[in-house]
Amino acid sequence: MERNKFASKMSQHYTKTICIAVVLVAVLFSLSSAAAAGSGAAVSVQLEALLEFKNGVADDPLGVLAGWRVGKSGDGAVRGGALPRHCNWTGVACDGAGQVTSIQLPESKLRGALSPFLGNISTLQVIDLTSNAFAGGIPPQLGRLGELEQLVVSSNYFAGGIPSSLCNCSAMWALALNVNNLTGAIPSCIGDLSNLEIFEAYLNNLDGELPPSMAKLKGIMVVDLSCNQLSGSIPPEIGDLSNLQILQLYENRFSGHIPRELGRCKNLTLLNIFSNGFTGEIPGELGELTNLEVMRLYKNALTSEIPRSLRRCVSLLNLDLSMNQLAGPIPPELGELPSLQRLSLHANRLAGTVPASLTNLVNLTILELSENHLSGPLPASIGSLRNLRRLIVQNNSLSGQIPASISNCTQLANASMSFNLFSGPLPAGLGRLQSLMFLSLGQNSLAGDIPDDLFDCGQLQKLDLSENSFTGGLSRLVGQLGNLTVLQLQGNALSGEIPEEIGNMTKLISLKLGRNRFAGHVPASISNMSSLQLLDLGHNRLDGVFPAEVFELRQLTILGAGSNRFAGPIPDAVANLRSLSFLDLSSNMLNGTVPAALGRLDQLLTLDLSHNRLAGAIPGAVIASMSNVQMYLNLSNNAFTGAIPAEIGGLVMVQTIDLSNNQLSGGVPATLAGCKNLYSLDLSGNSLTGELPANLFPQLDLLTTLNISGNDLDGEIPADIAALKHIQTLDVSRNAFAGAIPPALANLTALRSLNLSSNTFEGPVPDGGVFRNLTMSSLQGNAGLCGGKLLAPCHGHAAGKKRVFSRTGLVILVVLIALSTLLLLMVATILLVSYRRYRRKRRAADIAGDSPEAAVVVPELRRFSYGQLAAATNSFDQGNVIGSSNLSTVYKGVLAGDADGGMVVAVKRLNLEQFPSKSDKCFLTELATLSRLRHKNLARVVGYAWEAGKIKALVLDYMVNGDLDGAIHGGAAAPPPAPSRWTVRERLRVCVSVAHGLVYLHSGYDFPVVHCDVKPSNVLLDGDWEARVSDFGTARMLGVHLPAAANAAAQSTATSSAFRGTVGYMAPEFAYMRTVSTKVDVFSFGVLAMELFTGRRPTGTIEEDGVPLTLQQLVDNAVSRGLDGVHAVLDPRMKVATEADLSTAADVLAVALSCAAFEPADRPDMGAVLSSLLKMSKLVGED
C-alpha cells in the first residue's frame, strides 16, 4: 500500500516534470523564433545603411565598393549558420551573429558625402575612412552608435562643426578628425567621453577655447589640436590628466601663461605648443617631466630666463625654445641632459657666454644659438661634440679664435658662424671635417691665409669667407671642391692670380671674388662652370682682354666685372648670355663700339658701361632691344659721338639714364617722353644743341634729378617744366639758354638744388621756393639777370625783397649735390651686394618616358575633360571671367551633374603660349605636389584638365568674396566688405592668415614651395572673409623653382620669361637674377601688408611734401615719426578705435618693413613673421 502510494506520487511528479519540460521547450522555441526574426530585421537595417553609404559615394575610382551589391533574393537574415553576404564586402567586418562591427576603407579615394544611415548600425565599433575625399558635414546621427570605439575620418574634406551628439558615444576611445575643414568650437560635452584615450583634430579651422570638461578625460593619452585657430589659455586642470603622453597645440592662437600644473603630467613624452602667443616665463615645474623627450616652445612671446630646473628632464632629446624673448644667460645646467640631441635657442635675447658645460652633451647633433647677444669665445672643448652635425651661432658678438678642437667634430655638416667678431687665423685640421657641406664665416675679423687643408672638405657645397681680412693667394687646391655651389670670398685682401683649377668646380652657381687684390687674367677654365649664375670679379686688378670664356657661361644672370683693368672691345660673344639681367663692365679700359650683340640680351635690367674708352655712335637698334631695362642704364664717361638715338624712348621701365661726359651731339630727343618711369636723367658734359623738346617735361613727371649742364642747348626753358612736381635736383648750367627764368620754378616744392649759371638768362630772379636760399654761384654768368640782394635792381620791375645768401645755404647745396652724385655711384654697388644668398639647387622632377600624361598620375585630384569645363563656363564665355593675366584667365563656373550638385568653382585656364608642351612635365609633376598641399589658408585645388594642345587648367574652390585686391581698392570682382572688415583686427587677421599659408608652403611639405608672386590679387577671401593664398603653383609649373641648368633644358624661351612676378611686389634678387628662395615671398608679404594697412598700391604715385616716394619709403618715414606719423599714412577707411589699435598697426608696419629689406639675409623667415603677428593679435582682441 505504502509502495503504491509512493509510486502514485512519483507518477504525478514525473507527469508534472514532463509538462514543465514541454512548456520550456515551447517557450525556448518561441524565443528562438523571435530572436531569429529580430536578427533578420537588424541585418536588414544594417544592409540598408550600407547601401545608403554606397549611394552617398559619388566617385569610386578604385572600385572598392563595386562588390557592394545585393543578389536577387536579397541578403536577409542568417540562414543555415552562414553570415550575410555583406559581411564579406570590402572593408566590412561582422561579429559571429552577422552584425556589422567595422567599416574600414582608408586610402580608397572615395569622394562623396557620409550617409547619416550609418547611425542605424547600432553594433558599429570602428569607422575608419582615413585619406579619402568625403565632404559635407559629419552626420550627427553617428551619436546613436553607443558601441562605437573608433571614429577615424582624417584627411578628408569634412566641413561644419564637430557634432555634439558624438559625446553620446560612451565607448569611444579614439576620435581622429585631423586634416579636414571643420569649423566652430570643440563640443563642451567632450568630457563625457570618459573612455577617450586619443583625440586628434589638427589641421582644421576650429576656434574657441579648450572646453573645461576636457579635465574629466582621465584616461586621455594623446591630444593633438595643432594647426587650428583655438584661443584662450591652457586650463590649469590639465595637470589632472595623469595619463597624458602627447600634447600638441602648436600653430593656434593660445595666449596667457603656460600652466605650472603641466608639471604634474608625469607621463608626458611630447610637448609641442610652439607658434602661439604664450607669454610670461617658462614654468620651472616643467623640470618635473622626467619622461619628456621633446619640448618645443618656439615662436611664442616667452620672457625671463631659461629655468635651471630643466636639468631634471633627463629624457629630453629635443629642446627648442627659439624665437621668443628669453633673456639672461644660457644655464650651464643644460649640460646635464645626457640624452639631448637638439638644442635650439636662436632668435632670443640671451646674453653672456656659451657655457663650456654644453660640450658635455655628447649626443648633441644640432646646436642653434644664432641671433642672440652672446659674447666671448666658443668653448675650447667644442670638439667633444663628436656627433654634432649643425653648429649655428651667427649674428652674435662671439669673439676670439675659432677653437682648434672643432676639427674633432667630424660629423659636422653645417657650421654657420658669420656676423660675429671672430679673429685670428682659421684653425688647422679643418680638412678632417669630411661631412662638412656648409661653412659660413663671413662678416668677421678673421685673417691670415686660407689653410690648404680646408680644400680637403670634398663635400662642401657652400663656402663663405667674405668680409674678413684674409690675405695671400687662392690655392690651386680650391679645385678639389667639386661639389661647391656657392663660393664667397669678396671683401678680403686676397692677391695673386685666380688659379686655373677654379674651373674644376663645375657645380658652382655663385662665385664672388670682388673687392680683393686679384691680378692677371681670368683663367680660361672658368668656362667649365656651366651652371654659374652669378660672377662677381669687380674691384680687383684683373687685366688683359675681357676673357671670351666668360661668355660661354650661358646661365649667367649677374656679371660684375667693374673697376678692373680689362682692355679691348666688348666681344660679340656677349650675346650668348641670354639670361643676363645685370651687366657691369664699368671703370675698365674697354674700347671700340657698343656691339650689336648686346641687343640680344632681352632679359637685361641693368647695364653699366661707364668710365671706359668706348666710342662711336650709341646704336639705336641695341637700345631698342633693351625694352626690359628697368633699373639703370649708364654709358657715361666714354667717348660716344653722334646723336642720342630716338629709340631710347622705348625704355618705358627704366629709372635711371646716365649718358654724361661723352661727345654726343644733336638735340635732346623728343622720344625721351616715352621713359615714363624715369627718376634720374643725366645728359651733362656733351655737345647737345637746340632747344628742349616741347611737351617733354609733363611726360617725365616722376623725375627727381635732371642734369643737362655742359652742353650747347639754347632757347628758353619751357614753362611746362612746372610739371616736374618731384624734381629735387635741376642743373641746366653751362649752356646757352636765354629768356626769363620760368617763375614756376619757385613753385616746385621738392626742388632743393638748382644751378642756372653760365647761360644768357635775363630779367628778374623769381622769389620764393628754392630761390630763397640760392647762392650766387648758381646764378653767375647770366649778365641779364637782375633783382635780389646780390644783383643790380631791375629797371622797370619792382624790386624784390632783399635776400640773404648764407654760408649755411651753400653748405646745404654742396651736400645735396654730393649726396645725389654718391647715390648714382652707389646704385651698382648696392645691386651687387644685394645678392648675398642664392637659391639652393632644388631637385627637378625626373620624369621618364615621352608622355607626360603617362608618366605622372595625380590620383588625389579629379581630372576634368575640356567639355566639362566648357559646359561649366558657358564655353569659356567672357562674361564669366573673374580675373586674367598674361599667364592665365580665371572663369567662374558651375559644374553640371548630380554628383557635383551645381558646385561653383573657379576655372583657371592656363595660356598655352606661356605653358607650351615643353612645360608639360613641370605642369603634371607640380599637380602631384599641389594635390598634397592642404592647409586652411591655401586655396584648395579641386581638380585639373590636361589635353595636349587643347587645354591646361586648374579647378579651384570659388571664393564668394573675391580677392584681397578688390577688398582693399574696390572693383567689380569683389563685393564691398562690411565696415567692420576695415578694423585693425580684421586686417591683422588677414595678415596672420596669409602668413599661416606661406609658413605651410615654406615648411609644411617635403621641400619648401616658394610662391614667387604673393600679392593681394592672389589672396582670396572665402565666405567668412578668411584669407586663402592662391596661385602658389604657377611658378613651379613654369619651372621657376628649378636650378638654372635644369630650367634651361626643360623650358622654352617663352616659358622662362613668362613668369616675371609682379612689379612692386618682386624681391630685388628675383627681379634681377631670378633667384628663388623663401625670402622672395617674405619680401612680397611685407609689401602686401603695407598695402593692406595704408590702402596704397606699391606701383602708384606716392608723394610726401611734393617728393616722390616708394611705398616702403613712405612707411619707413611714418614709422620713424612714431604713432602720429603712422596714423597719417593709415587707410582712412580703417577704424582705429584705441591707442592699442594704432600701436598694433605701427607694429605691423614695422614687421612689414623688415620683410621688405633689400638684402634677403636681413629679412626674417615667415615663421618669425607669423610669430610676431600672432603676438600682436592679442593686443586687439583677435583671439
Swiss-Prot record:
Any one GO cellular component localisation term in the record = endosome
Q: What is its main location?
A: membrane
The record's Gene3D superfamilies line, in alphabetical order, gives: Phosphorylase Kinase, domain 1, Ribonuclease Inhibitor, Transferase(Phosphotransferase) domain 1
In terms of InterPro entries, this protein maps to: Kinase-like_dom_sf, Leu-rich_rpt, Leu-rich_rpt_typical-subtyp, LRR_dom_sf, LRR_N_plant-typ, Prot_kinase_dom, Ser/Thr_kinase_AS
The UniProt catalytic activity note for this protein reads: L-seryl-[protein] + ATP = O-phospho-L-seryl-[protein] + ADP + H(+); L-threonyl-[protein] + ATP = O-phospho-L-threonyl-[protein] + ADP + H(+)
Pfam families this protein is in? LRR_1, LRR_8, LRRNT_2, Pkinase
Give each disulfide bond as a residue pair: C87-C94, C167-C189
Signal peptide as annotated in the record:
1-41
Q: Where in the cell is it found?
A: Cell membrane
Active site, renumbered: D1013
What is the induction comment? Induced by flagellin (flg22).
Q: Which residues cross the membrane?
A: 810-830
Q: How does it sit in the membrane?
A: Single-pass membrane protein
Q: Which residues lie on this side of the membrane: Extracellular?
A: 42-809
Keyword Transport (UniProt)? no
Q: Where does the Protein kinase domain lie?
A: 876-1179
Which intervals lie on the Cytoplasmic side per UniProt?
831-1183
UniProt binding sites for ATP: I882, G883, S884, S885, N886, L887, S888, T889, V890, K908
Origin, by domain of life? Eukaryota
User: Which E.C. number(s) belong to this protein?
Assistant: 2.7.11.1
- Which GO biological process categories is it annotated with? defense response by callose deposition in cell wall; defense response to bacterium; detection of bacterium; receptor-mediated endocytosis
What family name appears in the similarity comment?
Belongs to the protein kinase superfamily. Ser/Thr protein kinase family.
Q: What is this protein called?
A: LRR receptor-like serine/threonine-protein kinase FLS2
Q: Which organism is it from?
A: Oryza sativa subsp. japonica
